[in-house]
Regions:
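Membrane-embedded alpha-helical bundles that constitute the cytochrome b-like, heme-associated redox core
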Residues: 1-144
Length: 144
């Protein structure tokens, strides 16, 4: 399939799919009225995935993103998720954005979307680190 499409068309197809995924997330968010828990998680995962793709393209080494770059991404995606949820409630319902943002980091309100995105980002980063460690070339013993 890739060979038939050619590299340019394949890249174009990927860009179209990224745009469709963004539109699908926005559509999901618009269809949810007050319960925007799931669309917010979807948006956070999308932010993390697009950040990963960007890092892979800019700092990736042999198809992998180094762990020091994944850690800030694992922090940025949940923060953007919490900010998106706070912005939504502030614009749609007039709720204080700072209070909604702070609620994402309180355990009294249960697991919020930012916490779930953080857990997923950390889990994927750890799996990536273990995978890199297991596949790294091991020094071979030298015999005299």
């Amino acid at each position: 399939m890739i060979k038939r499409l050619g590299p340019r068309r394949w890249q174009r197809l990927h860009r179209i799919v990224y745009a469709i995924a963004l539109l699908a997330t926005v559509h999901y968010w618009m269809q949810s009225k007050l319960e925007i828990w799931e669309p917010t998680i979807m948006a956070g995962i999308y932010v993390w995935l697009m950040g990963y793709r960007l890092l892979l393209k800019t700092v990736g080494v042999r198809g992998r993103v180094p762990l020091p770059w994944l850690a800030p991404l694992a922090l940025a995606a949940p923060l953007l998720t919490a900010a998106g949820e706070a912005l939504y409630f502030s614009l749609a319902y007039g709720a204080p954005a700072l209070r909604v943002f702070e609620a994402n980091f309180s355990l009294q309100t249960g697991l919020r979307p930012a916490a779930i995105v953080f857990a997923l980002a950390v889990a994927v980063s750890l799996v990536s680190a273990v995978r890199n460690w297991l596949s790294s070339p091991k020094p071979r013993p030298r015999f005299a």
